[in-house]
Amino acid sequence: MTLITPAINSSRRKTHTVRIGNLYIGSDHSIKTQSMTTTLTTDIDSTVEQIYALAEHNCDIVRVTVQGIKEAQACEKIKERLIALGLNIPLVADIHFFPQAAMLVADFADKVRINPGNYIDKRNMFKGTKIYTEASYAQSLLRLEEKFAPLVEKCKRLGKAMRIGVNHGSLSERIMQKYGDTIEGMVASAIEYIAVCEKLNYRDVVFSMKSSNPKIMVTAYRQLAKDLDARGWLYPLHLGVTEAGMGVDGIIKSAVGIGTLLAEGLGDTIRCSLTGCPTTEIPVCDSLLRHTKIYLDLPEKKNPFSLQHSENFVSAAEKPAKTTLWGDVYGVFLKLYPHHLTDFTPEELLEHLGVNPVTKEKAFTTPEGVVVPPELKDAPITDVLREHFLVFHHHQVPCLYEHNEEIWDSPAVHQAPFVHFHASDPFIHTSRDFFEKQGHQGKPTKLVFSRDFDNKEEAAISIATEFGALLLDGLGEAVVLDLPNLPLQDVLKIAFGTLQNAGVRLVKTEYISCPMCGRTLFDLEEVTTRIRKRTQHLPGLKIAIMGCIVNGPGEMADADFGFVGSKTGMIDLYVKHTCVKAHIPMEDAEEELIRLLQEHGVWKDPEETKLTV
């Protein structure tokens, strides 16, 4: 069980208690971790074995895919086997497109997850051809209630919970017609369904508002929480960035979204959707809860920069950049220590910083500058760095802290081209207070992030959560990362990964890959790795690698191109929302993807980009 429990003066959003099997969630209970099996649900032995492994890793809740009646029936046997093993872990059934399966599996599972975009209405890619009148829209809501109410009544009668899980890319035809593919549409989709639950006095409901884009996900959860609270509906929230991807990249994407919301007091259960073995998700969830505990233990603090509406969200993302010495990009600077300047040759140090010492070419993930120790500012190796980077030492820059407000309005600050702000813990709150008070006097601000991490994953979670939250709010013009115990390449990977996932600076190819489930039609981890190797030199491009057509098209809404399993051994290729090549044999599909990129003018040969990986 997760050990993070609510403090007496917790800043967590107040939510009512929902029972899921033998477990209770809500603001009076600890935040729970969740994962999903990757086995065929009809393979009872393998599914039970994987659930047992997840329980051994302290996973609190497990979800299985239920495509149809066979999978729903399998859940009865799975639950029986779990009870026989003494495992009381709650079992959640994941439903898409098939209300009959939901009605059956409610007899066996502890919770039923439905997607309001495809529970009643077939998923429809919006083309603007169907027009809903006020009368036909009202009629479609009556049909929704008629089809959805039986599940609500059954869950209420049996004491089973439900999750209404909205996905950004799979909104219903009705919602798309009225709202488009927007935050407002996501919230409206959730409200339509909970209105039926409220009417029937059923409140064992949890919400999720998932997207593969952390900016959209954070904004949607913020807006839903605001709208629910305004109605007095204190429903719990399940947090997740859908299809986060593999390895550290997936961890960073999850932390930018989930960590930001946890620090604001939102969230009662969480899942990090990482491609690969589901047990790898739980340590990441636990780490996220540890890193955000400092915020949950504080009294509630409003975020003055919270982007509550999609309109504000868009305008903030496009805010004009300030004129800086490092141009119009969000800058990355590394603090170097004496061992960096004495343990490496100049050529080695340049390579670690992303510069080819022979050709002088820079990688997309090369920092704008470095901060050097004052005692080494005149060292020969520092002179070499000056040929490639902006080089500073701290005595050259006004260093502002929350405890030296008396100098914030000083001549030194007014005359400086930029300032450094050193935020103490809690980092997010201290930084927001600084910008709210205009402590930077309108100057470009570098946020200094100092930590003594020895572990790359822990550093990634902390930086993506705390620094990522500020990026989503549009704060600062650069970051100075002070991480003396980590290799410089790891620090740069984390820094630029956080910028990319906060939508601030696109420096690499982005992959939206699902975490695998019982619907997956090919080896996602292996195929994703191969596609990544062939396309990682195309910065700014978003490629989705999805295991099936049930979730695939709906959860890759943010992708430029999609590689989606259509049936065993076959792949469909997408451009945005449109399937352009169908049923391609798996052995030909990767070449066809490259050909598709070439046809759309986004392909470059690797040597043209000269990307240092």
From Swiss-Prot:
Q: What highest taxon heads this organism's lineage?
A: Bacteria
Kindly state which reaction or reactions the protein catalyses. Answer: (2E)-4-hydroxy-3-methylbut-2-enyl diphosphate + oxidized [flavodoxin] + H2O + 2 H(+) = 2-C-methyl-D-erythritol 2,4-cyclic diphosphate + reduced [flavodoxin]
Record Gene3D superfamilies: Dihydropteroate synthase-like, Sulfite Reductase Hemoprotein, domain 1
User: A single Pfam family, by name?
Assistant: GcpE
Q: Which UniProt keywords apply?
A: 4Fe-4S, Iron, Iron-sulfur, Isoprene biosynthesis, Metal-binding, Oxidoreductase
* Top-tier EC class: oxidoreductase
Named in its record, the pathway it takes part in is:
Isoprenoid biosynthesis; isopentenyl diphosphate biosynthesis via DXP pathway; isopentenyl diphosphate from 1-deoxy-D-xylulose 5-phosphate: step 5/6
Output the Gene Ontology terms for molecular function: 4 iron, 4 sulfur cluster binding; 4-hydroxy-3-methylbut-2-en-1-yl diphosphate synthase activity (ferredoxin); 4-hydroxy-3-methylbut-2-enyl-diphosphate synthase activity (flavodoxin); iron ion binding
Q: Which family does it belong to?
A: Belongs to the IspG family.
Tell me, what does this protein do in biology? Converts 2C-methyl-D-erythritol 2,4-cyclodiphosphate (ME-2,4cPP) into 1-hydroxy-2-methyl-2-(E)-butenyl 4-diphosphate.
Question: Per its record, how is this protein called by name?
Answer: 4-hydroxy-3-methylbut-2-en-1-yl diphosphate synthase (flavodoxin)
